[in-house]
Amino acid sequence: MLENPSTPLSTGARPSYAGIWVPIVTPFADDATRSVDYGALYTLVARYRTQGVAGFVACGSTGEAAALTDQEQADVLDTVRAAADGLPVVMGVSGSALAPVLERMLRLAEHRPAAFLIPAPSYIRPSQDGIVEYFTALADASPVPVLLYDIPYRTGASIDAETLLALAAHPNIHGIKDCGGDADKTQRVIADGRLQVLAGEDAQVFGTLCAGGVGAIIAAAHVRTELFVEMVRAVQEQRLNDARQLHHALAPVIRLLFAATNPGPLKAWLAAEGQVKNVLRAPMAAASEALGQALVEAVGRV
């Protein structure tokens, strides 16, 4: 677990991000404005914090951050931190240009996240030099560590291996959530050893762990959380057959969770379980009750 998760970066050893991190959904009420249901959010986090997770990510892709106002994002962070009861909470921050992202990051830093999870700028497709400049400026300014987020199918910008290795030299850039879809790039960053690599693609957790990744930030960790935690433990203890069996057992659930755009299927499952309302904010659309029920049945078979 991260120690002193909201204090400025020190010159000591870097904190470990090993383990399973839950990128918590943002529950919405079934009302006219689809307001954030902070009570349901608190209850969810309190439930997951007892299941062996390393911590939480607030306002990531799974948390529908793009649909939240700046104030809602700050309130979500406060709620998750309160419910996490000492477990570290990483905060997602994203955008298309440096100045507004930097301003938002510094405002959110006042709410004491453990770290920031930051993807490449979206939509504008910057050069690799531009990506280095962007992350360097944010890492220079951040009072807490930065985790890179390579997810080109959402941002439109891939962070090349050479760029990641250049950014690894920054003392305030500690790791990466890897959704890059490039096994060679993943292995190069792991072999370099300076960035802690966390799987971000749910179906690739086992492979990333076996290659030397330290953990995962995955939407599927909402479902049978303890089995993902056990998978990490099994790989750490060199019980690869046990970890492989868990991977194959969870694979059908993972496929259903991404049968429609995340977090639609996940919210449908959580709604079927009575945890949240099956409500997303436009332009995201709720997944069908049938998909939610299929997930309930698939989870029941694990």
Map each language-model feature to its residues.
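Active-site beta->alpha loop and helix N-cap motifs at the rims of alpha/beta catalytic domains
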Residues: 2, 11-30, 34-156, 166
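Short glycine-rich loop/turn motifs that provide flexible caps or phosphate-binding loops at active sites
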Residues: 18, 54, 59-62, 91-94, ...
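Alpha-helix N-capping/helix-start residues
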Residues: 38, 70, 161, 237-240, ...
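A general structural signal for well-ordered alpha-helical segments in protein cores
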Residues: 41, 73, 77, 101, ...
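C-terminal alpha-helical cap/extension of soluble enzyme domains
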Residues: 2-3, 8-10, 16-29, 47, ...
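Basic, gly/Ser/Thr/Pro-rich low-complexity segments located predominantly at protein N termini
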Residues: 24, 65-68, 97, 180, ...
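Catalytic alpha/beta core domains of metabolic enzymes, predominantly
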Residues: 140-141, 152-258
